[in-house]
Amino acid sequence: MNKIVIQNPRIINEGRSFIGSVLVEGDKIAAVFEGEVPGNVRAEANQVIDATGKWLIPGVIDDQVHFRDPGLTHKGDIGTESRAAVAGGVTPFMDMPNTKPQTTTIADLEWKFNRAAEVSRANYSFFFGGTNDNMDEIRRLDRSRVPGLKLFLCSSSGNMLVDKKDSLERIFGEAGMLIAIHAEKEEVIRRNIQYYTNLHGEDLDISFHSKIRSEEACYQCSAEAVELATRLDSRLHILHLSTEKELSLLSNHLPLSEKKITGEVCVHHLWFHDGDYAQFGNRIKWNPSIKTIEDRAALREAVNNNTIDIVATDHAPHLPEEKQGSCLKAASGGPLIQHSLITMLELAMEGRFTYEKVVEKMAHMPAELFRIDRRGYIRPGYYADIVLIDPEQTWTVSKENILYKCGWSPFEGYTFHHGVWKTFVNGELAYGDGEVNDAVRGKEVRYL
């Protein structure tokens, strides 16, 4: 069995930060030491990595990605985007069902598992898509293999709108598993489109996006979902929260293990605000839209006070030409997974979060919320999903170092002040010194 000692990094884990060492045996963490690793342990290792001056954290768990496989692979695929993931310190991902075909049958879910086993450099998992008429398929799901159901409560990329009241009642009442939602009120969006096109015509610029996909569209839909989940005693997870108003629907009075209603925020809503549309244009067009600087401040505070439980990406690559055109025509979404951890570390450097909070929201809490088997922490017996950070690396995002298949990033030209030095996936070096190890394959994530 391969034995690796990672010696003398600063370990950031479970709210603590200390100089220590980690012993990896095979695909698991065998021991965690404070201070120097014992000499006999070091002597028995096949490899000793001197990580002095580096930081060691558990691999990031991203609960919302769109890797575009199958059917949309001109934008990205499981192979290419998992390469970007490990380069960004993401070791397990949860992929969304709005592909072609949509992941709304057991057969299509199995196709994704088989494809990921062949090509994914990171550990993999897939949400199952709920529709107006696939309750029989939902009942057949193996709950240990999927993180939950994904419902689109508005028309967004992929057109998987679930809009029949009886279908929603049945899913929330009978699914017996976590339900993750994209919450924007379809009627409000359509009304806003009608209003602004009547005033300004069809060729609306990007500044109208946050007016069309407005605060009220988000709040109304989230509030209705919370009411339904509360009434039917369901587990509800609201994805990509974008407004201060929605935060009133969530609570930080209970530990995560007791929460039935939880929330996620994405890095772009913590980084950008609507004043950035003038500079970045359609590159920062997402659904839900980027909102005000006040919303951004409230979302940051909600991460710090635990009203928001998870930070993720909604990684959704499109080709540059698909991002062109008016507000109503340009594709929504963008590639983020290679830069999500680094972005959060940059915000921590600015004093917005502690580094311990970044690790909590990107690794620990996803593992807890989704009840993932032995991932998300630096603990003996857990899978050795480990990221080593260089806290002194200064580098600029450019086309030369972007790994997304789509070839661009909203962070192009930005200089970051931390870098991912090495990423281990199940004890194997998946990324190191700027190179992806394409021989590594991730494992299927399991749920308890």
Provide a role label for each language-model segment:
Residues 9, 326, 380-446:
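C-terminal cap of metal-dependent C-N hydrolases
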Residues 95, 125-128, 235-240:
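Short catalytic-loop micro-motif centered on adjacent basic/acidic residues
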Residues 9, 22, 27, 53, ...:
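Divalent metal-coordination and catalytic microenvironments
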Residues 51-119:
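Metal-associated gating/positioning segment near the N- to mid-region
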Residues 114-130:
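A glycine-rich helix N-cap at a beta->alpha junction
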Residues 1-5, 10-58:
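Histidine-rich, glycine-flanked metal-binding segment
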Residues 203-224, 228-233, 283, 304-311, ...:
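His/Asp/Glu-enriched, well-ordered alpha-helical/loop segment
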Residues 136-311:
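Histidine/acidic residue-rich metal-binding segments in metalloenzymes
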